[in-house]
Amino acid sequence: MACARPLTGRTLPADESPCLTLILEPVSGEAAKNSTPVVVDKPGKPPPKRHRRQYNVTVSCNDCDKRLNFSVKTTCSTILTLQQLLTEDLDFLCSFCEAKNG
Protein backbone atom coordinates (compact mmCIF):
# COMPACT_ATOMS: atom_id res chain seq x y z
CA MET A 1 0.00 0.00 0.00
CA ALA A 2 1.48 3.35 -1.00
CA CYS A 3 1.61 5.94 1.73
CA ALA A 4 0.43 9.47 1.02
CA ARG A 5 3.27 11.90 1.60
CA PRO A 6 2.42 14.38 4.40
CA LEU A 7 2.63 18.10 3.72
CA THR A 8 5.53 18.98 6.01
CA GLY A 9 6.34 22.46 4.67
CA ARG A 10 3.24 24.17 6.02
CA THR A 11 3.74 27.25 8.22
CA LEU A 12 1.04 27.53 10.84
CA PRO A 13 -0.55 30.88 11.75
CA ALA A 14 -0.07 32.26 15.26
CA ASP A 15 -2.79 31.22 17.68
CA GLU A 16 -3.87 33.11 20.77
CA SER A 17 -5.05 30.01 22.67
CA PRO A 18 -3.54 29.30 26.07
CA CYS A 19 -0.65 26.83 26.26
CA LEU A 20 -1.48 23.24 27.12
CA THR A 21 0.86 20.92 28.98
CA LEU A 22 0.42 17.22 28.27
CA ILE A 23 1.85 14.92 30.93
CA LEU A 24 1.83 11.23 30.10
CA GLU A 25 2.25 8.84 33.01
CA PRO A 26 1.87 5.08 33.28
CA VAL A 27 -1.24 3.75 34.98
CA SER A 28 -0.64 3.33 38.71
CA GLY A 29 -1.09 -0.05 40.40
CA GLU A 30 -4.20 1.16 42.29
CA ALA A 31 -5.94 2.29 39.12
CA ALA A 32 -5.08 -1.00 37.44
CA LYS A 33 -6.51 -3.00 40.39
CA ASN A 34 -9.84 -1.15 40.18
CA SER A 35 -10.24 -1.69 36.45
CA THR A 36 -12.25 -4.49 34.89
CA PRO A 37 -10.15 -7.60 34.24
CA VAL A 38 -9.48 -8.45 30.63
CA VAL A 39 -9.70 -12.05 29.47
CA VAL A 40 -6.82 -12.92 27.18
CA ASP A 41 -6.73 -16.04 25.03
CA LYS A 42 -3.60 -18.11 24.78
CA PRO A 43 -0.93 -16.09 23.06
CA GLY A 44 -0.51 -17.22 19.53
CA LYS A 45 1.78 -16.06 16.86
CA PRO A 46 2.64 -12.37 17.35
CA PRO A 47 1.20 -10.09 14.67
CA PRO A 48 3.65 -9.13 11.95
CA LYS A 49 5.48 -5.87 12.57
CA ARG A 50 4.21 -3.05 10.42
CA HIS A 51 6.78 -1.34 8.23
CA ARG A 52 8.16 1.74 9.99
CA ARG A 53 10.07 4.56 8.30
CA GLN A 54 11.95 7.54 9.64
CA TYR A 55 10.43 10.98 9.02
CA ASN A 56 12.06 14.36 9.64
CA VAL A 57 9.55 16.91 10.95
CA THR A 58 9.95 20.70 11.06
CA VAL A 59 7.45 22.87 12.91
CA SER A 60 7.51 26.48 14.07
CA CYS A 61 7.42 27.65 17.67
CA ASN A 62 3.94 29.03 18.28
CA ASP A 63 5.32 32.18 19.98
CA CYS A 64 8.51 33.21 18.17
CA ASP A 65 8.34 31.25 14.87
CA LYS A 66 11.73 29.57 15.51
CA ARG A 67 12.06 26.37 13.45
CA LEU A 68 11.97 23.21 15.56
CA ASN A 69 13.29 20.01 13.98
CA PHE A 70 12.83 16.45 15.18
CA SER A 71 12.69 12.95 13.75
CA VAL A 72 10.18 10.18 14.29
CA LYS A 73 10.09 6.55 13.26
CA THR A 74 6.58 5.31 12.62
CA THR A 75 4.14 3.74 10.18
CA CYS A 76 2.40 5.44 7.25
CA SER A 77 -0.94 5.62 9.05
CA THR A 78 0.57 7.10 12.22
CA ILE A 79 2.55 9.79 10.36
CA LEU A 80 -0.70 10.92 8.75
CA THR A 81 -2.26 11.17 12.23
CA LEU A 82 0.74 13.22 13.37
CA GLN A 83 0.31 15.47 10.33
CA GLN A 84 -3.31 16.07 11.30
CA LEU A 85 -2.29 17.01 14.87
CA LEU A 86 0.45 19.34 13.64
CA THR A 87 -1.81 21.19 11.23
CA GLU A 88 -4.95 21.37 13.34
CA ASP A 89 -4.63 20.97 17.07
CA LEU A 90 -1.08 20.95 18.41
CA ASP A 91 1.18 23.90 19.23
CA PHE A 92 4.92 23.60 19.82
CA LEU A 93 7.06 25.94 21.91
CA CYS A 94 10.84 26.27 21.80
CA SER A 95 12.63 25.95 25.14
CA PHE A 96 13.01 29.74 25.47
CA CYS A 97 9.30 30.45 24.96
CA GLU A 98 8.32 27.53 27.21
CA ALA A 99 10.43 29.02 30.04
CA LYS A 100 9.04 32.50 29.32
CA ASN A 101 5.42 31.29 29.42
CA GLY A 102 6.13 28.80 32.23
Swiss-Prot record:
Keywords for this protein: Activator, DNA-binding, Early protein, G1/S host cell cycle checkpoint dysregulation by virus, Host cytoplasm, Host nucleus, Host-virus interaction, Inhibition of host innate immune response by virus, Inhibition of host interferon signaling pathway by virus, Interferon antiviral system evasion, Metal-binding, Modulation of host cell cycle by virus, Oncogene, Transcription, Transcription regulation, Viral immunoevasion, Zinc, Zinc-finger
UniProt-listed GO biological process terms: DNA-templated transcription; symbiont-mediated perturbation of host cell cycle G1/S transition checkpoint; symbiont-mediated suppression of host innate immune response; symbiont-mediated suppression of host type I interferon-mediated signaling pathway
Residues spanned by motif Nuclear export signal: 79-87
Post-translational modification remark: Highly phosphorylated.
Cited Pfam families: E7 (PF00527)
Compartments where located: Host cytoplasm; Host nucleus
Zinc finger annotations (unnamed) as residue ranges: 61-97
GO CC aspect terms: host cell cytoplasm; host cell nucleus
Record keyword Membrane present: no
Domain of life: Viruses
Residues covered by region (E7 terminal domain): 1-36
The protein's role, per its UniProt record: Plays a role in viral genome replication by driving entry of quiescent cells into the cell cycle. Stimulation of progression from G1 to S phase allows the virus to efficiently use the cellular DNA replicating machinery to achieve viral genome replication. E7 protein has both transforming and trans-activating activities. Induces the disassembly of the E2F1 transcription factor from RB1, with subsequent transcriptional activation of E2F1-regulated S-phase genes. Interferes with host histone deacetylation mediated by HDAC1 and HDAC2, leading to transcription activation.
Domain notes: The E7 terminal domain is an intrinsically disordered domain, whose flexibility and conformational transitions confer target adaptability to the oncoprotein. It allows adaptation to a variety of protein targets and exposes the PEST degradation sequence that regulates its turnover in the cell.
Quaternary structure, from the entry: Homodimer. Homooligomer. Interacts with host RB1; this interaction induces dissociation of RB1-E2F1 complex thereby disrupting RB1 activity. Interacts with host EP300; this interaction represses EP300 transcriptional activity. Interacts with protein E2; this interaction inhibits E7 oncogenic activity. Interacts with host TMEM173/STING; this interaction impairs the ability of TMEM173/STING to sense cytosolic DNA and promote the production of type I interferon (IFN-alpha and IFN-beta).
Protein name per Swiss-Prot or TrEMBL: Protein E7
Species of the source: Odocoileus virginianus papillomavirus 1 (DPV)
The encoding gene: E7
